[in-house]
Amino acid sequence: PGFRGIRHIGARTQAAPEMSFVPMELMQESGWQQNFALLAKYNASFDLQLYPDQADDAVALFAKHSDIPVIIDHCAGPYFLFDAAKRGAVPAAEPALSHWADAVWKLSKLPHVSIKLSGLGMYHPNWSAQNCRVIFQTIVDAFGPSRVMLGSNFPVDKLFKSYSEVVDVWNEWLGALSDHEQSESRTGAASRAYRLNL
């Protein structure tokens, strides 16, 4: 009774092969697509870690299966932050930001798709409420607070921030929203996507 769905790390990009997790574009494989469709039979949701380059494949697949709740993990993989961090560049000024933002907006057009605000430490070891605010704002603008949920990505992100520091950033960002909108992102979005009573 505690089973809610499965999570797949399918992030892959030719732009940064060293940051790819799978050897091929699985969402293009017919067998993989058939297995994905089986999730509806078991009333299961699907978490996906992907990169912006894969948004078109994801949208094409998910549009055919509106009965399967989908959660996009780790902010839709803004891997451009990694290079920006190495150069000390401001993320909001990065040309690659628009490519990532386009992917976020494409995914948001599907009403059964939600997104998880998590995992930023993997892309920007020194991420903060200030330098990654554009990530939060883009995601909230695209999906709306009712389809944005918070995630800590612990213990992985413990390499970059303590749990309390991560929560402090979420609280600072959410502080710009109404009480109802904050409640949606803190519990409402996850409760609906994972069919929980929160």
Task: Map each language-model feature to its residues.
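Glycine-rich phosphate-binding "P-loop"
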Residues: 8-27
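Short Gly/Pro-enriched loop/turn and capping motifs at secondary-structure junctions
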Residues: 120-122, 154-157
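Catalytic pocket-lining loop regions of alpha/beta-barrel enzymes
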Residues: 22-149
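Divalent metal-coordination and catalytic microenvironments
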Residues: 6, 39, 74, 115, ...
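Short, glycine/acidic-enriched loop or turn micro-motifs at the edges of active sites
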Residues: 11, 77, 156
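Mid-to-C-terminal alpha-helical segments outside catalytic/metal-binding sites
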Residues: 137-138, 142-149, 158-198
